[in-house]
From Swiss-Prot:
GMP binds at D352, G353, G354, G375, N376, G401, M402, A403. Belongs to the IMPDH/GMPR family. GuaC type 1 subfamily. This is GMP reductase. Keywords: CBS domain, Glycosome, GMP biosynthesis, Metal-binding, NAD, NADP, Oxidoreductase, Peroxisome, Potassium, Purine biosynthesis, Purine metabolism, Repeat. GO terms for molecular function: GMP reductase activity; IMP dehydrogenase activity; metal ion binding. The gene is GMPR.
Amino acid sequence: MAALGSLPTLPEGLTYDDVLLIPQRSPVRSRKAVNTSTRLSRNIHLKIPIVASNMDTVCEDKTAVTMAREGGIGILHRFCSIEEQCAMVRKVKRAQSFLIEDPRMILPSATKAEALEELNWSGRKGGVSCLMVVDDFTSRRLCGVLSKSDLIFATDSALVETLMTPVSRTVVSTNTAITLEEAREVMRTKRTSNIPLLGPKGELLYLITQSDILKLTGNRNATLDSRGRLIVGAAIGVKKEDHKRAAALVDAGADVLVVDIAHGHSDLCIDMVKALKVNPLTNKVDIIAGNIATAEAAQDLIDAGADGLKIGVGPGSICITRLVAGSGVPQLSAVMDCARVAKKHGVPCIADGGVKTAGDICKAIAAGADTVMLGNMLAGTDEAPGRVLVKDGKKVKIIRGMAGFGANISKAEREKRLDEDVFNDLVPEGVEGSVPCKGPLAPILKQLVGGLRSGISYCGSHSIADMQQRARFVRMSGAGLRESGSHDISKL
């Protein structure tokens, strides 16, 4: 009876289709002047507030590479083996960097002919402009540098040691923490195109080349780590084996871990966050936790040490948690409640799910989210790993929820634990479907960011932070929602 008696005072839950942002006087003269930079977590900064969802039909290494190059980040799904997920992390890290970890090397006793072969002089893919000359391939002590120009007039039998520029006349560095800007300044002042980075015993650790720096500086939107590599996140669960997975992912180079379960406000998730924050193998990266939908959940995860929060219980296009479990909070209200607590502690929030348009991104961020996580909107792109099918004569890609039957059966198959219990115990909270093939990911991101820039300017703001201070919402009726879209025409 107490529950019945409380019905008149039940809180009201709103989602993106229930509201609009009220336009305000804007000082913005060009959308290009709008700043879309934000934080993913306490220490991870992004150029655009878009995160690729950790779904096995949305984000693997190809999606993550494009996301980082465009200023966002991809979170690699965990529905694979530890080795497979770590391999994806390494692929992202190798995709773009100003620190070459495995530069081509040659011995001083090699001939010009051998050097030409190593340099790939014919210009085939994989060719390099210089070789690092080392005393042997084990100790890797640098003896000098051999460039293509050193070989032009040499005879085929000439030895590398007679042609190379000795290390005593080579610009080198022992600063393994050197930044992109510092490396560029060294090249400018010393007039060199290569900088070998050496260890305490003169051993070759890395190589920085002018061509790699030019590639990186040509794309200023990319989100990079301190070594100039693309940033990437990885999802983990809360089981015992996920402690091993987390350590392996950090070792492989993951910049952030996302503890990702359907009900993030649980002791399992809270305990996992605490364990990761005290484990020396994992506490050097930020930990994001979710999914949650209440202020109480936000506070508990922040108290556990979470560096970021993932908000959303049931709003996704392939999620049926609200139907199966009867639980959830409409997404706009969930974001507002969680963000109100998170802002007090300086912890960024991700609005995960329910986003159908660029306008929804604007509403989520105005409500307090620092980033939005997209699944459906990015599925179907060329980079997305979903399988391509032909449906009614049109190409489509599969998309599926990670709490669904198919995703969990595939995971069990990979882990070689597919037995009758897996089928009997599984209660799906996700479905499978298809989305049209959409082409490359980058143009889609540009359209979404363009819409966000417009939304920020309509709020009379220059940045996300300013928008969150100034934004005002108005509730609208069903008729208002219908009026908001195209109407009274036949679409072409």
